[in-house]
């Protein structure tokens, strides 16, 4: 049988071509890995920025809501002293509300979608709000005898809301 001999120039060209293709393949894999890492980092940064923005919005919405409750409380003190009418005070409070329509729903949506870890703490706030509002909606008589208890419940509400604001700040630091 005849032996087939391959000229060295062809063999050198084949080896060079294979080496080049292998180098391109390795380079592409490294580039692909770098791009994947870069994309993941950019996605993480965008996600953190969105969460920070939503946390700021939630904080502002919470403060407006809290201020409305506090203003209602302050307006109700004369009702407990017998110096004002509860219906007139509630009307004045609703006309001068800091919240806009849908603010509380927006707050709840942000809480549930972005910060579910805060739902329990906000539940404590809502429970305390319910106690305070019993004094404002006729659940507990607006008499001078109940004024001290009303003020104590409002002070407890303010402590709970301060604790919730602190938890919001903690989340901001963690982001």
Language-model region placement:
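Short hydrophobic membrane-inserting helices
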Residues: 1-19
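Conserved non-transmembrane functional hotspots
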Residues: 21-175
